[in-house]
């Protein structure tokens, strides 16, 4: 049975405002580069080519980086059964299913759209969670698919990286079109502006990522009808992470932005620099939803 997908208007508003600010920063940056002598055609071609590559191949890169293996229904019947059932409720096409063989208990979703998605879980996650908790985590990842979070965050993060490398390239290899940048202090001004743009975009992307994690938690609660199951899963994953060997955590640290909980142990990082809200905040929101649904 399909469930009504109710939106959190406050959360949606904060996400839209953050995306608006990010777009404004990028437009300012590109206009600034153009004014100071960087060719507009070069910028458009450079961004266009790399965005296309990122859009079409990001899922393959993520699977290769993590060592995730696509599994068939015969290889993982329980996992496929859960995802098939959840997709019917969420009104989603069924994604490919993958397993990562690592002790780190985690999960992620990737793919450029709802028809080209992959949901992956680790063997550590399947070993540690109950079926109800595993289903809640899968629902969280499917919420990312439904909200197209992978495409949104990939594009947002990519533009930040492109802005940085365009400036770096221009500083090393000349004026890329001539103009005002040759005037005194021009190179230093471009460098200073690039630093400011990178810092601001970095913080905005982190904020956007945190909002979308909250949104995926809410989506999982709606799909399963049991917010408490996801809260329980988050507590277990967070607790187990502290006992996972450091070498295992370091092997997957590049995937932290994709995971349901970052693969870190010990001291936490400041919320403003994190891709995910704190587990405590997420659990508090889920507990509130559980009370509202009861």
Swiss-Prot record:
The record's cofactor note says: Binds 1 zinc ion per subunit.
Gene3D superfamilies, from UniProt? Metalloproteases ('zincins'), catalytic domain (3.30.2010.10)
Which enzyme class, named as a word?
A: hydrolase
Residues at which Zn(2+) binds: 140, 144, 213
**Entry GO MF terms:** metalloendopeptidase activity; zinc ion binding
Record-annotated active site? 141
Q: Which cofactor does it need?
A: Zn(2+)
Enumerate the transmembrane spans: 15-35, 36-56, 151-171, 185-205
Offer a single GO CC term for the protein: plasma membrane
Which UniProt keywords are listed? Cell membrane, Hydrolase, Membrane, Metal-binding, Metalloprotease, Protease, Transmembrane, Transmembrane helix, Zinc
Q: Which InterPro entries match?
A: HtpX_protease (IPR050083), Pept_M48_protease_HtpX (IPR022919), Peptidase_M48 (IPR001915)
Q: What is its EC number?
A: 3.4.24.-
- A single Pfam family it belongs to is Peptidase_M48
From the UniProt record, give one GO term of the biological process aspect. Answer: proteolysis
Q: Where in the cell is it found?
A: Cell membrane
Membership in a protein family: Belongs to the peptidase M48B family.
Against PANTHER family, the record matches this protein to: PROTEASE HTPX, PROTEASE HTPX HOMOLOG
Q: What is this protein called?
A: Protease HtpX homolog 2
Lineage, broadest ranks: Archaea, Methanobacteriati, Methanobacteriota, Stenosarchaea group, Methanomicrobia
């Amino acid at each position: 049975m399909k469930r009504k997908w109710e939106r959190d208007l406050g959360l949606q508003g904060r996400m839209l405002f953050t995306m608006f600010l990010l777009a404004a920063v990028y437009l300012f940056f590109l206009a600034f580069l153009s004014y100071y002598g960087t060719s507009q055609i070069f910028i458009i071609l450079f961004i266009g080519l790399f965005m296309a590559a990122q859009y079409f191949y990001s899922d393959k890169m993520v699977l290769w980086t993590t060592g995730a293996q696509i599994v068939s229904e015969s290889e993982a019947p329980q996992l496929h059964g859960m995802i098939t059932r959840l997709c019917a409720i969420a009104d989603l096409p069924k994604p490919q299913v993958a397993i990562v063989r690592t002790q780190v208990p985690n999960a992620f979703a990737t793919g450029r759209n709802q028809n080209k998605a992959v949901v992956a879980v680790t063997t550590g996650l399947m070993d540690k969670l109950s079926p109800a908790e595993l289903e809640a985590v899968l629902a969280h990842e499917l919420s990312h698919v439904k909200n197209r979070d992978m495409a949104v965050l990939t594009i947002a993060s990519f533009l930040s990286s492109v802005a940085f490398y365009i400036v770096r390239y221009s500083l090393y290899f000349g004026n890329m079109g001539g103009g005002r940048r040759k005037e005194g202090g021009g190179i230093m001004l471009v460098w200073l502006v690039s630093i400011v743009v990178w810092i601001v975009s970095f913080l905005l992307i982190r904020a956007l990522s945190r909002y979308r994690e909250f949104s995926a938690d809410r989506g999982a609660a709606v799909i399963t009808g049991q917010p408490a199951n996801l809260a329980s899963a988050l507590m277990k994953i967070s607790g187990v992470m502290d006992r996972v060997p450091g070498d295992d955590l370091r092997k997957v640290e590049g995937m932290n932005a994709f995971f349901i909980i970052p693969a870190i142990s010990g001291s936490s990082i400041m919320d403003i620099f994190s891709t995910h809200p704190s587990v405590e905040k997420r659990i508090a929101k889920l507990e509130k939803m559980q009370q509202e649904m009861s």
